[in-house]
Amino acid sequence: MSGTINPPDGGGSGARNPPVVRQRVLAPPKAGLLKDIKSVVEETFFHDAPLRDFKGQTPAKKALLGIQAVFPIIGWAREYTLRKFRGDLIAGLTIASLCIPQDIGYAKLANVDPKYGLYSSFVPPLIYAGMGSSRDIAIGPVAVVSLLVGTLCQAVIDPKKNPEDYLRLVFTATFFAGIFQAGLGFLRLGFLIDFLSHAAVVGFMGGAAITIALQQLKGFLGIKTFTKKTDIVSVMHSVFKNAEHGWNWQTIVIGASFLTFLLVTKFIGKRNRKLFWVPAIAPLISVIISTFFVFIFRADKQGVQIVKHIDQGINPISVHKIFFSGKYFTEGIRIGGIAGMVALTEAVAIARTFAAMKDYQIDGNKEMIALGTMNVVGSMTSCYIATGSFSRSAVNFMAGVETAVSNIVMAIVVALTLEFITPLFKYTPNAILAAIIISAVLGLIDIDAAILIWRIDKLDFLACMGAFLGVIFISVEIGLLIAVVISFAKILLQVTRPRTTVLGKLPNSNVYRNTLQYPDAAQIPGILIIRVDSAIYFSNSNYVRERASRWVREEQENAKEYGMPAIRFVIIEMSPVTDIDTSGIHSIEELLKSLEKQEIQLILANPGPVVIEKLYASKFVEEIGEKNIFLTVGDAVAVCSTEVAEQQT
């Protein structure tokens, strides 16, 4: 398939372009079955080449690198300096002041005592500091996961009627969430979390934020009896049903005053990044001031609900409380899988965001192992599911964090709080915790992101709104299910209905582009050029064949109507076709036979190495003929247009 071709000139002046040497489309050297399998496995599970640092090292060095891979702290601790510690100390103290009041509030979302929220900001951050690869992420309970755990566990066991078994179910869910997370990382299946699209996450988080805020109306208004459901209709019905006698005006004044204070401090922090510490310490200041006034004026005697007693002391061992059998065992696995997935998605997204801002890399699979390990250990030390908190991580970042030591500092402060300070929270009003949670979750509602999604991709926006509406009108778990289903539906739609376009030639060039994108791109008389923007698999092969056949029919009808030359060649531009399977080849064979019956020749242009190798292996190249496979669309058009011109004369 060599020689020269003389493409016709594009200007009609009679001048001829210089001869162009036609290049043959080559198949790559055969690699062999084992090599192919090895290549696929490496690209799927080891695309980041995790073993590259082990090459050429002594056994002792390999052992050290292996330990360092599991515990990254060993690597960066050798280069740790006093300057870095100063930054980590300031950041750790700052996020500790934020996490303590948040943890007490988030524990209520999970329907557990406040101490368990504090426990979950002690052990998990210590584990993560040794095993995690993110320098900026701050670990602890978060609002969405706390609500998810509380909602799912409450549907199985009533926390008021059977608090002991409820707590055991929470620990069981935490254990299996950790197993699920660590298992994904160990098996290098981290890519699975990418199936939950960004749009679906935006919608789910926004819906969860509104649901959480509505749940806080119980403490914010001083309502004693409140619905266990999370949908907006049930919550608002419960709120207004108690409006006449169930609301407490002192509680409302406390909540509204401090919510205003918290929102003002957040506004100040956004306007001036140097004042990042103002919104960070505002929750703790709010707790201190409100607790002081409730104690002085004994507002609890006037109906203001308070936290009451919080046990002193650090985390007790809880491994004996995990259900490893019985009727709640499978429920623990189910809840742990769901909550673990959400926690993992949030943490990895946060870690990637701040890593990109500081221009360093994180290992997603190591992150999953670290997060999973800390939750497994946490379940054995009276913690519930912890993950990366966006609000704390943002404060951590702005405070000048250098390494994960900030998590250690935060954990130490929380431990000291558990040992010595928890009795002081006895008179903390529930309204202030509600105000803190409301101010925190408002940041999860990303209206700008939703507007951007609408502008870019309407199908993505459907996923976003489906998850959002599912959460606020039905339940958190249904909203998550909708998010996953729509994300998968979009993937299936893109796979089964790939984009296919007609190409035309741009004026005064040898460049061929989409005629819809470039209206001045002219189609060549007698030639139809089609580009398939996807791999051709069993799932879309029939669609590709039928779409190409439909275009041929439409072009034939147009040619007949306008007196243009009939289609004699169909060129398929295959450079975007990264792969093809047996069904794909079979569909092209059927298209070839169908076109031959209409006296139309099928031409392939620029098939990639994987595709051309399979075309040779299937004997399709012999069927279509090597002379009908070209390196470029330009080469194919040059030959085909000459033949069309000859047929016309």
UniProtKB/Swiss-Prot annotation:
Keyword Metal-binding: no
Induction notes from the record: In roots by sulfate starvation or after selenate treatment.
Extracellular side, ranges: 108-111, 158-168, 211-248, 297-334, 389-404, 453-465
Membrane topology classification: Multi-pass membrane protein
Annotated signal sequence range: none
Cited PROSITE patterns: SLC26A, STAS
Compartments, record wording: Membrane
Domain of life per record: Eukaryota
Cytoplasmic side: 1-86, 133-136, 270-275, 356-367, 426-431, 487-649
Tissue expression pattern: Expressed in lateral root cap, root hairs, epidermal and cortical cells of roots.
CDD domains (alphabetical): STAS_SulP_like_sulfate_transporter
GO biological process entries: sulfate transmembrane transport
Keyword field contains Electron transport: no
GO CC field: membrane
Limits of the STAS domain: 517-640
Role, per record: High-affinity H(+)/sulfate cotransporter that mediates the uptake of the environmental sulfate by plant roots under low-sulfur conditions. Plays a central role in the regulation of sulfate assimilation.
PANTHER family assigned: SULFATE TRANSPORTER
Family statement drawn from the similarity comment of this UniProt entry: Belongs to the SLC26A/SulP transporter (TC 2.A.53) family.
Protein name per UniProt: Sulfate transporter 1.1
Organism: Arabidopsis thaliana
